[in-house]
C-alpha cells in the first residue's frame, strides 16, 4: 500500500510538471529587447539607458550616430521629451547567442504621440542589435535601426 501511494504521488507530480506550459527564458539580445520595449512603453529614459553599455553605439532612423553614454542619453532624451511612446512592436525577429555575445534582428514599429498635440506618428523599419553579457547582465553594444525603405509595407504582425 505504501509503495502504491508513493508511485501514485510520483506519477501525479510528473503529470503536473510536464503538463505545465514550457517557455525558454529569454537571454541575450532577446532579453535586452524585452527590457528596452518595457522601458520605452513606460517612457522611462533611465530604464532605456540601462539597456545600453556605457560604450555602446546607436544609430536611430534620421538621427546622427550616438556613441557612448552621454550621446545615447541625448538621443533618447530628445525623442522622449518631444514624444510619448504609445506602442512598440518588434516583428520578424531572429536571435543568435554565442557565449557572451548575442545578435538580434527584425522589424520594428514605434508609435509616438507628439507632446505638441500633433497626430501620432508611426515609425517603421529594420533593426540589428549586438548585445554582450557584462557584469552579469546583457546590454546593447550596437543598436542599428533604419527606416523602412520606400515601397515596402512595413512590419508584419
Feature-to-residue mapping (PLM):
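Bacterial N-terminal signal peptides
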Residues: 7-19
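Sec/Tat signal peptide C-region and signal peptidase I cleavage site
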Residues: 20-24
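Short beta-strand edge/turn micro-motifs at domain boundaries
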Residues: 124-151
